[in-house]
């Protein structure tokens, strides 16, 4: 978000008795057609415009005129919540504004009361009939409607679409999973990854395009392996890690995940085999080398406990047995 004040110093009435918002509005673009929503781009974005049914990831701050501190902001959150247009966003002006934005864009908007809090406002925070200013940064957006509609089709219906469509929808599902994973919502992330995998499994591609499907599957297998580790289900993590290795037997990330899973299952020799192979591919990888150190430490503890248990068993047999005595 912009580190400067929202009005860039426009805090006093000018010679013509125009308010700061009136002065600011003179250089802003009308995107509603009635000057109810005005826009000033601070930083240009890139790519496509936000689609009407998208889920958006944004940072925003809302200001009242003559006030430097926002009355509403989500910038304090480490990871903003994903919001769906038409459902989670209550300001009409913000929705229209977002539809005019591209990924990475930072913009300033003025919303007239009709597009904000109406003639009544929102007491005591928002006075009646108030124009508000919002600074909005579009971090990312996902076209969830396209994905949801496609996933609702039967396998036969999906097969009528070109491969690129399937790959795009699968990628969207995976991106949703990644977002949920970053929110520590591992179960929900797993559901999205499995939806992506189902789409890719259903699709039969011609030989010259099969590598595209395999590449997409590899990413999902790696995501699922990591997610199951987070869910403390190492058997499933190992299964998906091994599926990734079928596609790319030297994939360091897949070898690493398999090693982690085996370590959690106390299968130390298998864990070592996977981790050594991973280290061979990426000898200076900090995570792999640390996992090998952890494995060595766990194995030492395991062997110490085994020796101690054996010692106690034999000691008990020598001192406490009466078998064969008269």
From Swiss-Prot:
Its main location: cytoplasm. Keywords: Cytoplasm, Differentiation, Meiosis, Nucleus, Repeat, RNA-mediated gene silencing, Spermatogenesis, TPR repeat. TPR repeats lie at residues 170-203, 218-251, 252-285. GO terms for cellular component: cytoplasm; cytosol; synaptonemal complex. SMART domains: TPR (SM00028). GO terms for biological process: cell differentiation; meiotic cell cycle; piRNA processing; protein folding; regulatory ncRNA-mediated gene silencing; spermatogenesis; transposable element silencing by piRNA-mediated DNA methylation. It is found in: Cytoplasm, Cytosol; Nucleus. Residues 53-142 form the PPIase FKBP-type domain. InterPro entries: FKBP6/shu, PPIase_dom_sf, PPIase_FKBP_dom, TPR-like_helical_dom_sf, TPR_rpt. SUPFAM superfamilies: FKBP-like, TPR-like. Signal peptide: none annotated. One of its GO terms (molecular function) is Hsp90 protein binding. Interacts with HSP72/HSPA2 and CLTC. Interacts with GAPDH; leading to inhibit GAPDH catalytic activity. Interacts (via TPR repeats) with HSP90. Co-chaperone required during spermatogenesis to repress transposable elements and prevent their mobilization, which is essential for the germline integrity. Acts via the piRNA metabolic process, which mediates the repression of transposable elements during meiosis by forming complexes composed of piRNAs and Piwi proteins and govern the methylation and subsequent repression of transposons. Acts as a co-chaperone via its interaction with HSP90 and is required for the piRNA amplification process, the secondary piRNA biogenesis. Belongs to the FKBP6 family. This is Inactive peptidyl-prolyl cis-trans isomerase FKBP6. It comes from Bos taurus. The gene is FKBP6.
